[in-house]
């Protein structure tokens, strides 16, 4: 017995079949993982301080896929995964962007609004003569 196609599962999910939505997610998990890996590497998250792991991106991608279900229209002639791909990718990039924004806010000093610590040269080089 062959597995049902994405378009058929999407139609069932649009009618409220949660099992079909879960199968749709399961059958397309490979694409979600591949996309998560691409974004993880391209965003250089390995060396960042954002604390985002590939699993986080995969979860967001799965949510993106599920959000694509209600708007999919088979009569347009586009395959479901082609339609859902931007939803998946955007959900992942939104996570990265939002995390980066939160990271930037933590870096900003509330008193002077700068993203770095204000330091006087005299504090760094005490007792040194001025070069001016």
Where are these regions (language model features)?
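Alpha-helical promoter-recognition and RNA polymerase-docking modules of transcription initiation factors
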Residues: 1-102
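Charged, low-cysteine interdomain linkers and short loop/connector segments
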Residues: 96-132
């Amino acid at each position: 017995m062959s597995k049902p196609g994405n378009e058929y599962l999407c139609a069932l999910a649009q009618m409220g079949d949660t099992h079909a939505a879960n199968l749709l997610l399961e059958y397309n998990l490979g694409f979600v993982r591949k996309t998560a890996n691409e974004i993880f590497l391209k965003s250089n998250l390995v060396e960042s301080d954002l604390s985002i792991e590939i699993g986080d991106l995969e979860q967001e991608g799965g949510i993106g896929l599920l959000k694509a279900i209600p708007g999919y229209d088979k009569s347009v002639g586009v395959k479901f995964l082609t339609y859902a791909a931007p939803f998946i990718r955007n959900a992942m990039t939104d996570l990265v962007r939002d995390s980066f924004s939160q990271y930037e806010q933590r870096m900003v000093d509330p008193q002077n609004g700068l993203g770095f610590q204000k330091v006087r040269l005299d504090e760094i080089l005490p007792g040194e003569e001025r070069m001016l």
